[in-house]
């Protein structure tokens, strides 16, 4: 596999650019300069999360033991680790791509409890150690496509979700699998204040059909680049479904519930005309406000080094997953 060069100072976005982005975000949220000057506790609380200097930084993740199955070592150029861990959507910690890395250091992931229940014969609770020791870990190099029309290639580490589901023995009534993120507004500022969290309803929830969850490509991910996940990437466990848009990859999961009926999902509740339940990567179905025909590749270059490439149906995994949607109108069921 081709090695990707590391970031240099020339690749770093100028600090002024980040301040401008945040100013635009605040303006879009209706927070004016005059309003920000008011000495209220609420505004002080909001602004404290944008200063970026006194928040705890997360320690480096512990090295993990894992194998590299040949079928998942795609011959693709990896996105530099710095960008995988520094360019994130995790609105619980802010709207700017740099906010999660800056703000998530206070997220404590050990101890952790993940409960699996609902339409199962054998409910199960996993602790922090179970997440990395109960199942053999694998490194899988997957494409990652955001609904915002940018993409990465990431060496995720984890285990197939179907192995966990087999342990709990889904009942014949189980048709869907629902996931829920940790709810902790005291350490997740986006849950505490709608100006920081994009106005979403929290805790963040996502779901898959049972057959999607059982597919061999679907992973519960506990690491990246050889180490345990950092908080900004969804530690200690997140969902990875490589043929779907990134917002399906729910982070910091605390519960998995098998259900009879289709569960609600956060972005679909927020804007059902823009974010469908399925969220399969599809170059032929545009977002109402932008095209999905191509994508911006997040690579080793700087902000002016923009590479675009055509978007692949199912993000390049059509041979493996297209049969799941046989007979389904992908334009209606986006």
UniProtKB/Swiss-Prot annotation:
For Mo-molybdopterin, which residues are the binding ones? 88, 91-92, 146, 181, 233, 238, 249-251
PANTHER family noted in UniProt: PROTEIN-METHIONINE-SULFOXIDE REDUCTASE, PROTEIN-METHIONINE-SULFOXIDE REDUCTASE CATALYTIC SUBUNIT MSRP
GO BP field: protein repair
- What is its subcellular localisation? Periplasm
Cofactor(s) the protein requires to work: Mo-molybdopterin
Q: Which reaction does it catalyse?
A: L-methionyl-[protein] + a quinone + H2O = L-methionyl-(S)-S-oxide-[protein] + a quinol; L-methionyl-[protein] + a quinone + H2O = L-methionyl-(R)-S-oxide-[protein] + a quinol
Transmembrane residue ranges: none
Task: Quote one Gene Ontology molecular function term.
Answer: oxidoreductase activity, acting on a sulfur group of donors, quinone or similar compound as acceptor
Please name the InterPro entries in this protein's record.
MsrP, OxRdtase_Mopterin-bd_dom, OxRdtase_Mopterin-bd_sf, TAT_signal
Cross-referenced PROSITE patterns, in alphabetical order? TAT
Question: Its Enzyme Commission number?
Answer: 1.8.5.-
Describe its assembly.
Heterodimer of a catalytic subunit (MsrP) and a heme-binding subunit (MsrQ).
What GO terms fall under cellular component here? periplasmic space
UniProt cross-references to Pfam families, sorted A to Z: Oxidored_molyb
Q: Which UniProt keywords apply?
A: Metal-binding, Molybdenum, Oxidoreductase, Periplasm, Signal
Q: How, per the record, is the cofactor bound?
A: Binds 1 Mo-molybdopterin (Mo-MPT) cofactor per subunit.
Q: What is this protein called?
A: Protein-methionine-sulfoxide reductase catalytic subunit MsrP
Q: Which residues form the signal peptide?
A: 1-44
Q: Which family does it belong to?
A: Belongs to the MsrP family.
The task this protein performs is described as:
Part of the MsrPQ system that repairs oxidized periplasmic proteins containing methionine sulfoxide residues (Met-O), using respiratory chain electrons. Thus protects these proteins from oxidative-stress damage caused by reactive species of oxygen and chlorine generated by the host defense mechanisms. MsrPQ is essential for the maintenance of envelope integrity under bleach stress, rescuing a wide series of structurally unrelated periplasmic proteins from methionine oxidation.
Free-text description of this protein's post-translational modifications in UniProt = Predicted to be exported by the Tat system. The position of the signal peptide cleavage has not been experimentally proven.
């Amino acid at each position: 596999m081709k090695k990707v060069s590391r970031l240099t100072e020339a690749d770093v976005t100028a600090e002024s650019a980040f301040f401008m982005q945040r100013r635009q975000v605040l303006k879009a949220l209706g927070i004016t300069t005059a309003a920000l000057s008011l000495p209220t506790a609420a505004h002080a609380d909001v602004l404290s999360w944008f200063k970026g200097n006194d928040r705890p930084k997360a320690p480096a993740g512990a090295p993990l033991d894992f194998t590299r199955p040949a079928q998942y070592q795609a011959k693709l150029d990896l996105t530099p680790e710095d960008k995988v861990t520094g360019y994130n959507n995790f609105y619980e910690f802010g709207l700017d791509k740099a906010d999660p890395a800056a703000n998530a250091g206070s997220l404590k992931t050990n101890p952790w409890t993940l409960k699996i229940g609902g339409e199962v014969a054998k409910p199960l609770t996993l602790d922090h150690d179970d997440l990395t020791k109960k199942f053999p870990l694998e490194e899988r190099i997957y494409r990652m496509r955001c609904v915002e029309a940018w993409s990465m290639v990431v060496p995720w580490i984890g285990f197939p979700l179907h192995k966990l589901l087999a342990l709990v023995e889904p009942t014949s009534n189980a048709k869907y699998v629902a996931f829920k993120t940790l709810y902790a507004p005291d350490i997740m500022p986006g849950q505490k204040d709608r100006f920081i969290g994009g106005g979403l309803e929290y805790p963040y929830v996502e779901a898959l059909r049972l057959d999607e969850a059982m597919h061999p490509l679907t992973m519960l991910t506990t690491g990246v680049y050889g180490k345990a996940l950092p908080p900004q990437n969804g530690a200690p466990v997140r969902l990875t479904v490589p043929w779907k848009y990134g917002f399906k990859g729910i982070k910091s999961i605390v519960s998995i519930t098998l259900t009879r009926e289709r569960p609600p999902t956060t972005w679909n509740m927020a804007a059902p005309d823009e974010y469908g339940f399925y969220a399969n990567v599809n170059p032929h179905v545009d977002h109402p406000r932008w095209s999905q025909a191509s994508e911006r590749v997040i690579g080793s270059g700087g902000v002016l080094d923009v590479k675009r490439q055509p978007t692949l149906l199912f993000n390049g995994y059509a041979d493996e997953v297209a049969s799941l949607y046989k007979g389904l109108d992908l334009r209606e069921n986006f």
